Amino acid sequence: MEQGAEDIPVVYLHDIKRQYSQGEATLTILDGAKLALWAGQSVALVAPSGSGKSTLLHIAGLLEHPDEGEVYVSGAATSALTDAERTQIRRTDIGFVYQSHRLLPEFTALENVMLPQMIRGLKRKETISRSKEILSYLGLADRITHRPSELSGGEQQRVAIARAVANAPRVLFADEPTGNLDPHTADYVFNALMQLVKATQVAMLIATHNMELAARMDRRVSLQDGVVVELE
């Protein structure tokens, strides 16, 4: 990508190819996939199970290497980066939310949100203040001392969202974030994500089967034969 371009996507996938061995066969999951994610824009990735949604998210989030192609973050190529450099980008620029909240059970809601900030090297006083602010924004001000087992499914997922945005990432990836929730709770969690996108101008890519939620996002894309296609 040209560094001098006026508008540069937060993340840009260029000609991504990813294959896996399946016995003696080779399974091609992504084959020349391209996708640009822009600041303040929400994108729904809607595709059948096994089509490569999670693989695409993992490659875009620098959790997995493509076999071919390039992942650009803020205009900079990442293929030649060391594992340590990729980890640093994930800590500062990328947030993840999964279908399962993946909160640490021995920590309170507040401590779970503080953790990524502490790992980044921020001072404890600062992390406490910011974590309380985010949890309050997500309607959890009275739940900060509760451990995950003491929270409802929707509350657990909102804590997971708070943790994902704790370091003010530039892009947020969510893999079926409402998949384990009832419709009412799913709607509440989805609205929380959308509010954060608009408030912080983070770019967001959500893999989802929920067409109703996908329809409320800025863009909708799918995977067909390993290629990203725009949907109406």
From Swiss-Prot:
Keywords: ATP-binding, Cell inner membrane, Cell membrane, Membrane, Nucleotide-binding, Translocase, Transport
UniProt: ATP binding residues: A47, P48, S49, G50, S51, G52, K53, S54
Pfam families: ABC_tran
Entry-linked InterPro entries: AAA+_ATPase, ABC_transporter-like_ATP-bd, ABC_transporter-like_CS, ABC_transpr_LolD-like, MacB-like_ATP-bd, P-loop_NTPase
Ranges of residues in domain ABC transporter: 11-231
Top-level EC class as recorded in UniProt: translocase
Primary localization: membrane
GO MF term list: ATP binding; ATP hydrolysis activity; transmembrane transporter activity
Database matches in Gene3D superfamilies: P-loop containing nucleotide triphosphate hydrolases
GO cellular component, one term: plasma membrane
Keyword Glycosyltransferase in annotation: no
Subcellular location: Cell inner membrane
EC number: 7.6.2.-
Function: Part of the ABC transporter complex LolCDE involved in the translocation of mature outer membrane-directed lipoproteins, from the inner membrane to the periplasmic chaperone, LolA. Responsible for the formation of the LolA-lipoprotein complex in an ATP-dependent manner.
Quaternary state and interactors: The complex is composed of two ATP-binding proteins (LolD) and two transmembrane proteins (LolC and LolE).
Protein name: Lipoprotein-releasing system ATP-binding protein LolD 2
Source organism of the structure: Rhodopseudomonas palustris (strain ATCC BAA-98 / CGA009)
